[in-house]
Amino acid sequence: MNIKDIGVIIAKKPLKENTFIITVFTKNHGLYSGVVKEFSKKSKFIYQEGNIIDFLWQARLHEHIGMAKCELIKSYTGYFITNKAKLYAFNSVISLIKELFHEREEHSKFFLFLINYLDNLSKNFCFRDYINFELALLAETGYKLDLTKCGVSHVTTDLIYVSPKSARALSYEVGKPYKDKLLMLPRFLLSDNSEITLEEKRQALALTNYFFNRYLFHNNRQVEARQTFIEYTLNNF
């Protein structure tokens, strides 16, 4: 059987000499892995993580790993390799997708979200965009946070907390008696114009980290590329 789609290469590992297994996040078919062969400089350039490709997957049976053929559409390597903030954000993003999405599970809308994020990242690293990516990833995996209004009073002002139980924002008045048990809601997530302080970066990463750990990172397992991104971001403010 054949699968033809557009995709982003999110992993590549050696199988034997000049032969690799690539994992591709495709628009209409989710994650697919296939065997590719590299016999030229051109093919080595094509099979790089982050490349957008035309993807052809062929196998006798659907459950087989299959062979893959790819044609390059766009490469981001040159945009990320010389900028650590961009590179670490990129590595974190594709590692999270590889970790949290199941093979052959469609995420077509999120695929478009990823392409838009990579385009923006190629131009400029933005911490707000990165956190919004993690929030979107949580939502895509079934754990959406509602930060638009207070989960109790429904007011839309003075929101400074997030309930770890309901994943909803809470106003100052509602949350004050329980503040030691609540997560902080970074101000920049409520306004596109606000400057982002180091403390707000810590709050934002603690917010998404809590829900990743509670629902998705089992047995306290962490994504190494994400940890590298966090350490770099908090130490290079």
UniProtKB/Swiss-Prot annotation:
GO terms for cellular component: bacterial nucleoid. The lineage of its organism: Bacteria, Pseudomonadati, Pseudomonadota, Alphaproteobacteria, Rickettsiales. GO terms for biological process: DNA recombination; double-strand break repair. Belongs to the RecO family. Involved in DNA repair and RecF pathway recombination. Pfam families: RecO_C, RecO_N. SUPFAM superfamilies: ArfGap/RecO-like zinc finger, Nucleic acid-binding proteins. This is DNA repair protein RecO. Keywords: DNA damage, DNA recombination, DNA repair. It comes from the Bacteria. The keyword DNA repair applies. The gene is recO. InterPro entries: ARFGAP/RecO (IPR037278), DNA_rep/recomb_RecO_N (IPR022572), NA-bd_OB-fold (IPR012340), RecO (IPR003717), RecO_C (IPR042242).
